[in-house]
C-alpha cells in the first residue's frame, strides 16, 4: 500500500530521519522529518493554474504546533488550538524567507506550505526540523523550486560554536541563538539574538551553520532522486523585448524621477512615468504588450535605474553616498504622563516609542509546547497605514508587525537588567508615525531611549541600522541606512543592532547567490561604523538611564520572607493579604521562593504594606516592649495582640506589681496596653508581662521593682533575691525543686 522512502543521517550528535510516501499522499509533496524525538510533517500543494491579475508569487507558509505533540491538552474553554501564536507566526516567516527567492521568476500559481509539529521531545526545537521538512517537501513536489535549502541553529558556548544546541542549552548556557538557512552555494537567511558579540563571532557562526547543514541538503537530494514527482511544465516568461521597450520609453524620465529626494514627490514622479509607459505600450484597444508584462517590466526598469546610478556614480536615491546615515533627531520625555517616551526620527522614518512599567501581575503568560511560562519584557510594533501616506486595514497585528516587533525585542533584551535587580514587567510600544525604510531599527533606537527615560537601568544603549547591497557581476556597493526603495530593489537586506560593545541582534535576507563571506564581512564592518554614529546621535538626548523612575511609574519594594511564613501572610482563603491590599492600596505578589514584591505609585502605601508583612513574619525579641491590645480576658490572665497578628498571654501574676484577684479589675477587652516579651514556654506559647512596664511611659521598670523589693526585704531583715516571674515557669520551678 505504501511506497515509503527514507533517508537517515547523524547530524550533530542526533539522528535526522526524512520519510515520505506514507502520510498525506494526495499532497504534491509530503515529508515527515524527525530529529531526536521531535517530528514534523510538512506538506506542499500548488494550484494547477496561475492566479490571474497578480504580479507577485502567491506563497503561503503555515507552521502550526499541536498540543498533543508535547502530551498536553490546550487550555481555554474550547480545549482546542486557536489562532496562531506569536511563535507559530515567527516560524512561518522563518521558513518563508529562505524559500521564497528560490521559486522561478514568474511563478504565479497559489502555493501553500503547511508544517505541523507532531511530537516534541522538549529538547530539539521544532523550528529547524520544520524548515528542513518544508525544504524536502518542496523538492519532492515538482513545483519550480530551485532548492533544496538547509537550516541550522548555532549556539556559542564557552567560546565555541555548537550545532543545534538543546532547548535548555540555548536558554541557559549559550550567548548566541542564531538560525541560518541557505543552499549548497549561498546563505539566504539569518535570524539571531546575541549577548553583545563581535562581528567576527557573528559571521563565524553564519559560516559554521552553512557548513554544517550541507549534509542535510545532500540527504534531501538523495531522497528526491528516489521519490520526487515530475517537475511542472513551467518556464520563466521571456520579457526581454518588453523590458527593452519600457526602457526606451521611460529611462531618462525615470532617472530624473529618482533624483527627487523627498519620498512623496519621488513617488508622484515615478507614478507619472508609469502612466506614460502604460499609455505608450498599452493604449486601450491597441496593446503592444499585455498590461501585466508591462507592469512587471516597469518594476524591473525601476530596479535597473536605481542600481545603475549607485554602481556608476555612488549616488543614492536621496543624494547620499553609500556610507552616510540620514539625519537623526532624538527626543525623550515627549509624553507627559508616560513612564518613559522617545521620538526617534531618521530622515523620513519616525517612531514614537513608549515604555511602561508594571508589576508581576502584568507579566504575559505564554502557553507553549514546553509548558506555560511568564514573560516580563514585551515589545509591540505598530505600523499604521498613515505612516506611508496611505489608507488601509486597521486591526490586529499582521505577520510583518509581529516579526519586526520580535526583531526589536531580540535587540534590546540582552541589555535589560535581570529580574532580581529590577523586578518590573516592561512593555515597549513602537508607533511608526513615518516610514521610509528601517522602521524596525528605529524601534530599537527609540525603544532604548524610552527605557532609559523611564529609568530602566540598561547595561548600555542599543542602536540598530538597516543595510543593503547592490551586486552586479564583480561590482558591488554596500549601502548604510537603506530607504524603502533600496530595500525592495537591492540584493541583500540585513539589519544589525547592538551596543558599543557588540552585536545583540542580526537579521539577514539575501535574494541572490554570489554574496561571499568577504562581502558580508565588509557589510558588517560598515554596519558597525553606522551603529557607532547612531549611538553618538542618540547620546545627544540621553546617555544612560535616569537615576529615578518616572513620576507615574509604580515603585516596587522587594523583601524576602521565610517560605514557612507564606501561608501566614496569605491567610486562610487569602484573607490576610486581601486586607493588606485593601487597606494600603499596594499590589502584592508572593513567589514560592518567599520573594515578596510590593508595588504602588505611592511610597507611603509601599511602606505601610512592607511594615505590615514584616510584622507578620518577624519574630518578637525577648526583653523588648511592644504596644498591644487586650483581645480576651480569662480567669488565669489576658490575651494580648501585640505584634502584628501575634497574640500572647499576660498571666494574672504579670498584670500588676500587686496581687490581682480578678483579671477584669486591671484590664478589659479592647484596652491598649504595653507589654514586655518574656519568651515562650515549653509548649511554644508566648509569655508577656505588663507589671514590669510603666503603662504611661512604656519604660521597663524591672530594676525599679527589684530595688523596691530588695528594700522591703532589707527592712524585714530578709536576704535579697531575684524577682520571681509568674505563670507557667513559676510552677515549673516549684516542680523542679520538689524533684
From Swiss-Prot:
Main localization category: cytoplasm
InterPro entries noted in UniProt: ExoRNase_PH_dom1, ExoRNase_PH_dom2, ExoRNase_PH_dom2_sf, KH_dom, KH_dom_type_1, KH_dom_type_1_sf, NA-bd_OB-fold, PNPase
UniProt cross-references to PROSITE patterns, sorted A to Z: KH_TYPE_1, S1
EC class (word): transferase
Biased composition (Basic and acidic residues): 701-739
Region (Disordered): 694-739
CDD domains documented for this protein: KH-I_PNPase, RNase_PH_PNPase_1, RNase_PH_PNPase_2, S1_PNPase
Listed Pfam families: KH_1, PNPase, RNase_PH, RNase_PH_C, S1
Entry's Gene Ontology molecular function annotations: 3'-5'-RNA exonuclease activity; magnesium ion binding; polyribonucleotide nucleotidyltransferase activity; RNA binding
Localization: Cytoplasm
Keywords: Cytoplasm, Magnesium, Metal-binding, Nucleotidyltransferase, RNA-binding, Transferase
A GO BP annotation: mRNA catabolic process
Cofactor entry: Mg(2+)
Its EC number(s): 2.7.7.8
Binding site residues for Mg(2+): 487, 493
Entries under SUPFAM superfamilies matching the protein: Eukaryotic type KH-domain (KH-domain type I), Nucleic acid-binding proteins, Ribonuclease PH domain 2-like, Ribosomal protein S5 domain 2-like
Domain of life: Bacteria
Listed GO CC annotations: cytosol
SMART domains in UniProt: KH, S1
Catalyzed reaction equations: RNA(n+1) + phosphate = RNA(n) + a ribonucleoside 5'-diphosphate
Segments forming domain S1 motif: 623-691
All residue ranges annotated as the KH domain in the record: 554-613
NCBIfam families: polynuc_phos, PRK11824.1
Protein family: Belongs to the polyribonucleotide nucleotidyltransferase family.
Protein name (database record): Polyribonucleotide nucleotidyltransferase
Organism (species): Methylobacterium radiotolerans (strain ATCC 27329 / DSM 1819 / JCM 2831 / NBRC 15690 / NCIMB 10815 / 0-1)
Amino acid at each position: 500500500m505504501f511506497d515509503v522512502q527514507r533517508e537517515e543521517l547523524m547530524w550533530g550528535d542526533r539522528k535526522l530521519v526524512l520519510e515520505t510516501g506514507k502520510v498525506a499522499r494526495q499532497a504534491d509533496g509530503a515529508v515527515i522529518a524527525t530529529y531526536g524525538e521531535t517530528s514534523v510533517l510538512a506538506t506542499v500543494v500548488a494550484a494547477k493554474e496561475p492566479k490571474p491579475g497578480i504580479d507577485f508569487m502567491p506563497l503561503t507558509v503555515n507552521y502550526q504546533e499541536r498540543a498533543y505533540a508535547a502530551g498536553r491538552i490546550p487550555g481555554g474553554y474550547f480545549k482546542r488550538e486557536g489562532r496562531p501564536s506569536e511563535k507559530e507566526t515567527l516560524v512561518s516567516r522563518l521558513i518563508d524567507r529562505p524559500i521564497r527567492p528560490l521559486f522561478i521568476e514568474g511563478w504565479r500559481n497559489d502555493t501553500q506550505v503547511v508544517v505541523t509539529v507532531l511530537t516534541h521531545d522538549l529538547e530539539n526545537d521544532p523550528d529547524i526540523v520544520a524548515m528542513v521538512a518544508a525544504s524536502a517537501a518542496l523538492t519532492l513536489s515538482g513545483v519550480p523550486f530551485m532548492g533544496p535549502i538547509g537550516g541550522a541553529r548555532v549556539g556559542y558556548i564557552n567560546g565555541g560554536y555548537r550545532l543545534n544546541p538543546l532547548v535548555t542549552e540555548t536558554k541557559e548556557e549559550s550567548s548566541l541563538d542564531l538560525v541560518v538557512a541557505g543552499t549548497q552555494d549561498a546563505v539566504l537567511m539569518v535570524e539571531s539574538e546575541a549577548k553583545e558579540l563581535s562581528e567576527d563571532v557573528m559571521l563565524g557562526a553564519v559560516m559554521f551553520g552553512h557548513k554544517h547543514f550541507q549534509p542535510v541538503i545532500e540527504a534531501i537530494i538523495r531522497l528526491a532522486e528516489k521519490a520526487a514527482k515530475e517537475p511542472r511544465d513551467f518556464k520563466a516568461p521571456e520579457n526581454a523585448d518588453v523590458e527593452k521597450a519600457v526602457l526606451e520609453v521611460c529611462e531618462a524620465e525615470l532617472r530624473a524621477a529618482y533624483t527627487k529626494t523627498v519620498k512623496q514627490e519621488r513617488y508622484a514622479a515615478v507614478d507619472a512615468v508609469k502612466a506614460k509607459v502604460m499609455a505608450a505600450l498599452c493604449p486601450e484597444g491597441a496593446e503592444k504588450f499585455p498590461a501585466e508584462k508591462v507592469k512587471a517590466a516597469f518594476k524591473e526598469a525601476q530596479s535597473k535605474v536605481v542600481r545603475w546610478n549607485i554602481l556608476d556614480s555612488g549616488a543614492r536615491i536621496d543624494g547620499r553616498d553609500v556610507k552616510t546615515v540620514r539625519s537623526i533627531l532624538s527626543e525623550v520625555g515627549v509624553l507627559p504622563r508616560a513612564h518613559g517616551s522617545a521620538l526617534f526620527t531618521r530622515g523620513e522614518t519616525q517612531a514614537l516609542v513608549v515604555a511602561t512599567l508594571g508589576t508581576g501581575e502584568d507579566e504575559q503568560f505564554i502557553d507553549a509546547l514546553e509548558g506555560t511560562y511568564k514573560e516580563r519584557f514585551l515589545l509591540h510594533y505598530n505600523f499604521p497605514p498613515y505612516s506611508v501616506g496611505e489608507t488601509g486595514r486597521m486591526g490586529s497585528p499582521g505577520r510583518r508587525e509581529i516579526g519586526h516587533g520580535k526583531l526589536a525585542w531580540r535587540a534590546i533584551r540582552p541589555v535589560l537588567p535581570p529580574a532580581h535587580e529590577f523586578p518590573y514587567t516592561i512593555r515597549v510600544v513602537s508607533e511608526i508615525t513615518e516610514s521610509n525604510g528601517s522602521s524596525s531599527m528605529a524601534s530599537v533606537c527609540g525603544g532604548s531611549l524610552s527605557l532609559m527615560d523611564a529609568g530602566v537601568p540598561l547595561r548600555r544603549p542599543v542602536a540598530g541600522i538597516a543595510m543593503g547591497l547592490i551586486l552586479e557581476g564583480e561590482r558591488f556597493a554596500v549601502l548604510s541606512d537603506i530607504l524603502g526603495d533600496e530595500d525592495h530593489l537591492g540584493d541583500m537586506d540585513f539589519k544589525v543592532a547592538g551596543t558599543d560593545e557588540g552585536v545583540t541582534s542580526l537579521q539577514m535576507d539575501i535574494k541572490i547567490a554570489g554574496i561571499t563571506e568577504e562581502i558580508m564581512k565588509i557589510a558588517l564592518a560598515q554596519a558597525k561604523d553606522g551603529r557607532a554614529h547612531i549611538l553618538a546621535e542618540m547620546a545627544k538626548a540621553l546617555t544612560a538611564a535616569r537615576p529615578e523612575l518616572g513620576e507615574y511609574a509604580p515603585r516596587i519594594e522587594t523583601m524576602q520572607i521565610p517560605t514557612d511564613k507564606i501561608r501566614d501572610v496569605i491567610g486562610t482563603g487569602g484573607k490576610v493579604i486581601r486586607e493588606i491590599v485593601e487597606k494600603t492600596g499596594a499590589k502584592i505578589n508572593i513567589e514560592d521562593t518567599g520573594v515578596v514584591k510590593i508595588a504602588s505609585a505611592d511610597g507611603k502605601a509601599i511602606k505601610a504594606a512592607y511594615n505590615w508583612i514584616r510584622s507578620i513574619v518577624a519574630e518578637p525579641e525577648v526583653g523588648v516592649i511592644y504596644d498591644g491590645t487586650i483581645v480576651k480576658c480569662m480567669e488565669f490572665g489576658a490575651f494580648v495582640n501585640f505584634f502584628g497578628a501575634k497574640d500572647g498571654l499576660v498571666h494574672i501574676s504579670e498584670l500588676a506589681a500587686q496581687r490581682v484577684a480578678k483579671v477584669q479589675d486591671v484590664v478589659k477587652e479592647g484596652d491598649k496596653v504595653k507589654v514586655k516579651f518574656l519568651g515562650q514556654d515549653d509548649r511554644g506559647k508566648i509569655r508577656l508581662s505588663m507589671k514590669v512596664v510603666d503603662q504611661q511611659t512604656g519604660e521597663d521598670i524591672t530594676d525599679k521593682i527589684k530595688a523596691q523589693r530588695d528594700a522591703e526585704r532589707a527592712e524585714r531583715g530578709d536576704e535579697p533575691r531575684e524577682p520571681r516571674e509568674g505563670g507557667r515557669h513559676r510552677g515549673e520551678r516549684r516542680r523542679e525543686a520538689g524533684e
